[in-house]
Curated annotation (Swiss-Prot):
Quaternary structure (record): Part of the 50S ribosomal subunit. Binds 23S rRNA.
Protein name: Large ribosomal subunit protein eL20
Keywords: Ribonucleoprotein, Ribosomal protein, RNA-binding, rRNA-binding
GO biological process: translation
InterPro entries in UniProt: Ribosomal_eL20 (IPR028877), Ribosomal_eL20_dom (IPR023573)
Entry GO CC: ribonucleoprotein complex; ribosome
Pfam families on file: Ribosomal_L18A
Encoding gene, per UniProt annotation: rpl18a
The family this protein is said to belong to: Belongs to the eukaryotic ribosomal protein eL20 family.
Annotated signal peptide: none
Amino acid sequence: MGEVKFYLVEGRMLIRHDRMPEWWKFRKYVRALKPEHAVEKVLSELGSNHKVKRYHVKIERVVEVPPEEVPDRTLLVLASLTRWVKP
């Protein structure tokens, strides 16, 4: 298995496509094995949180970033875990 890396995914999503459509920019930091997996994770999260269809999301850039540049503390804490403990 490969090493899990941090990726920055930037793009635009179409909000209110039926009345007064508007494109919103987004920047999302995710952990993934490959850039393709990072894009898949972002599409899944945007669809879940904002009810946006995949064809209403345009990915503009996927960049691997070092852990020092990730502003999301939750991702850094998850990356430092070595195992899960079930109660």
